[in-house]
Swiss-Prot record:
GO terms for molecular function: DNA-binding transcription factor activity, RNA polymerase II-specific; RNA polymerase II transcription regulatory region sequence-specific DNA binding; zinc ion binding. Transmembrane segments: none annotated. One of its GO terms (cellular component) is nucleus. Its main location: nucleus. PANTHER family: TRANSCRIPTION ACTIVATOR OF GLUCONEOGENESIS ERT1, ZN(II)2CYS6 TRANSCRIPTION FACTOR (EUROFUNG)-RELATED. This is Transcription activator of gluconeogenesis acuK. Residues 68-96 bind DNA. The gene is acuK. InterPro entries: ERT1_acuK_gluconeogen_tf, PAS_13, Zn2-C6_fun-type_DNA-bd_sf, Zn2Cys6_DnaBD.
Length: 688
């Protein structure tokens, strides 16, 4: 027998004497052998012999998921229980905790607490484990009547005197007052008289002494830790044991990505679930789903208003409105002028740009104009802040109704850009468009304008470009009936509906034209750059422009006369006539544009053209007469410091009526593969 006999259990005296003879007098060390068995606590049989490690009938020890720090340092087998058997025998049960593994490279920035594995599918809570009493054999006893289960358990068993994580009924609003769920001193305090209607059905069957108070006996409340932990996978119904991950951090991240992906197209009832909103007082709020009856995370039961980390002040700031209102409005942070607002009046003009606030609470998911009745919004001023400071700890009015979130889904959310928000919806397009657009008459008007303005040589160049695509237009439209043409116009209006939002959000001078060259949409920046008003470009106001890019009248050189568009509009009385794109460009730029359009109209559907051009400033007859007197002032303006602000942009092209620009445009086709509209972005080359 070798010296390893010291690790076995005591043997009979005869065997011990034989061992002393074989080992050459080991001495008294063999009288008190050490038992190094740990984990399951099974010791070898008292036979005087150590079990053969290669014996297949030898009982196998269950491998622990993570060894404690002491066993990890000693390279010994540990168990899942804390404290483990070895630390108990060595008197180190108070310092027994999980050892720290070496992190993978992709987890070097992850906190150590996030890498802690779950035990039996349940969330591991150090506070819960430290408060549990020790049983006789040194193991933690949650409840003597609780039966062990090998399957993952995400729902606390009703036999234990605990508080159910998944509630079936609504929480009482005044039952809890807490700090942030990530606070180290996060505790829960309950009012015993106020929890009759707040706890779940299984908790109501418990004795009145059992509650969720932090001062409750730890032996009766195994869930004495934080009631809500954002890293708890049970709150999202994540079964970490079914995911083949070696650490909790990676499994939780993978599960959260799947949770977000599967909730992208949920119904309105699941909109709060895909947001993952946080409940009041830092706790998760739950309500039963209509299908399975199980609890779903993220819903606000009973119409309660969720708090942001349990702070009523942050909640009132995010809503930005009194508690008497029934809807949460994003625009409440920046209200209109004259309604108790602290925003200056010049920032709330209809033409002034507005910024929108992005909140961190559930109120940011509400539609800007989702209310069903007019209401007055109040801003975040000093009076509101002072009243919120002196309010109750729960921050809710005793009689006021709870605000509700009315957003159906995040993908249908519309952001409020300004006060002049479009009030129509896309369905109005399909209801109002009853007639096809008269493209034939518009092409005739374009031909008459080109013949009247341009010289015969340039008119011929433009006519050749349009004639090259004329057969393609005839071939694609000869099979279309009236219903198809009406549908074509609906497609145009619906596409224009989307482009208007892009134009308002983009700071680049942009215009959108029909295939005839008529302006259909224009951005504010383009009007600032060229001086053309939006109503004039869209045909809502008369066009009094006389600038055709020729010489200045009275300069001594001959220039081709041009009749204002009033005579053209007279050919179609009673109907407004939008401005043609050819009226915004000089002669050479118009010829180049139609040559490129003939190549791109039925060619590359994804192609675009990027080149330079000269845009014409909007000038009336009075402006042209006063232009010679202002040339000296314009020259001195350039010597002082170049272009600055909107006033400086208006001075571009002041001298000769032309603006040197670089522009890019493309052709958008409809469902019949016919050129539908032209989208153009321009930028002045004089801006530095």
């Amino acid at each position: 027998m070798t010296v390893d006999a010291q690790d076995s259990t005591p043997a009979p005296p005869a065997d011990r004497r034989g061992a002393e003879l074989e080992t050459g007098g080991v001495g008294e060390q063999s009288e008190q052998p050490k038992n190094k068995s740990n984990g399951d606590g099974n010791a070898p049989a008292e036979t005087g012999q150590k079990p053969n490690p290669k014996d297949p009938s030898r009982p196998r020890r269950k491998k622990a998921r993570r060894a404690c720090f002491a066993c990890q340092r000693a390279h010994l087998t540990c168990g899942d229980e804390r404290p483990c058997q070895r630390c108990i025998k060595r008197g180190l049960q108070d310092a027994c905790h999980d050892g720290v593994r070496k992190k993978a490279k992709y987890l070097h920035d992850a906190p150590d607490g996030a890498l802690m594995p779950g035990i039996g599918g349940n969330f591991y809570n150090n506070t819960m484990r430290s408060n549990l009493p020790l049983s006789r054999n040194g193991a933690n006893a949650v409840n003597a009547t609780t039966q062990p289960s090998s399957s993952p358990n995400f729902y606390p068993t009703p036999q234990s005197n605990s508080y159910s994580v998944y509630q079936e009924n609504t929480m009482n609003q005044n039952s809890f007052t807490s700090q942030s769920p990530v606070s180290p001193t996060f505790t829960l305090k309950a009012n015993p008289a106020a929890r009759n209607n707040s706890l779940s059905s299984q908790v109501n069957q418990q004795p009145p002494s059992t509650g969720v108070s932090g001062a409750t006996n730890p032996s009766q409340n195994p869930f004495a830790g934080p009631f809500f932990d954002p890293s708890d996978p049970a709150l999202f119904n994540f079964d970490l044991s079914s995911m083949n991950f070696e650490n909790r951090y990676g499994a939780l991240e993978f599960g959260m990505l799947g949770h977000m992906a599967t909730g992208a197209g949920d119904s309105p009832s699941d909109s709060a679930t895909q947001r993952g909103s946080m409940g009041r007082s830092g706790s998760a709020q739950f309500s039963g789903t209509p299908i399975t009856g199980a609890a779903a995370f993220g819903e606000s039961p009973g119409g309660q208003q969720p708090f942001i980390f349990g702070d009523p002040l942050l909640n009132e700031w995010s809503s930005g409105q009194p508690t008497g209102q029934t809807h949460v409005n994003v625009g409440g942070v920046y209200p209109q002028s004259g309604q108790g607002s602290v925003i200056p009046g010049h920032l709330t003009k209809a033409d002034a740009p507005h910024a929108f606030a992005i909140e961190s609470g559930p109120g940011s998911f509400a539609s800007p104009n989702a209310t069903t009745s007019p209401q007055i919004t109040t801003g975040f001023d000093d009076a509101t802040f002072s009243s919120a400071v002196t309010a109750k700890s729960n921050g809710l009015s005793a009689n006021g109704p709870r605000p509700t979130i009315t957003t159906p889904s995040l993908k249908h959310q519309n952001l409020q850009v300004g006060v002049r928000r479009r009030q129509r919806n896309p369905s109005s397009i399909y209801e109002n468009v009853k007639e096809p657009y008269a493209y034939t008459n518009r092409f005739h008007n374009l031909t008459a304008f080109i013949q009247r303005r341009f010289s015969p040589q340039k008119t011929l160049q433009i006519a050749k470009a349009l004639a090259s695509i004329r057969p393609s237009f005839i071939a694609t439209t000869k099979t279309l009936n009236r219903d198809d043409l009406i549908f074509m116009e609906k497609c145009f209006q619906r596409t224009l509906f989307e482009y208007e939002d892009f134009i308002n959000a983009c700071g680049t001078p942009t215009i959108v034209c029909r295939r005839t060259g008529e302006i259909a949409a224009v951005g504010k920046e383009f009007s600032i750059l060229t001086g053309w008003k939006k109503d004039v470009l869209l045909g809502k106001e008369p066009n009094l422009n006389v600038n055709t890019g020729g010489s200045v009248p009275g300069s001594g050189t001959s220039s081709r006369s041009f009749t204002p568009r009033g005579s053209v509009a007279e050919s179609t009385p009673g109907r407004p006539q939008p401005v043609f794109l050819a009226e915004l460009l000089d002669d050479d730029s118009v010829v180049e544009f139609y040559e490129d359009f003939a190549r791109l109209a039925f060619g590359d559907s994804r192609g675009s053209v990027m080149t330079t051009c000269k845009l014409l400033k909007y000038k009336t007859k009075e402006d042209m007469e006063n232009q010679s007197d202002d040339n000296q002032r314009w020259n001195s303006h350039l010597r002082k410091g170049g272009i600055a602000s909107e006033a400086g942009m208006n001075q571009l092209g002041f001298k000769d009526g032309k603006i040197e620009c670089a522009y890019c445009w493309t052709v958008k086709r409809d469902v019949f593969d016919i050129p539908m509209l032209i989208v153009m972005n321009a930028s002045s080359t004089n801006l530095r």
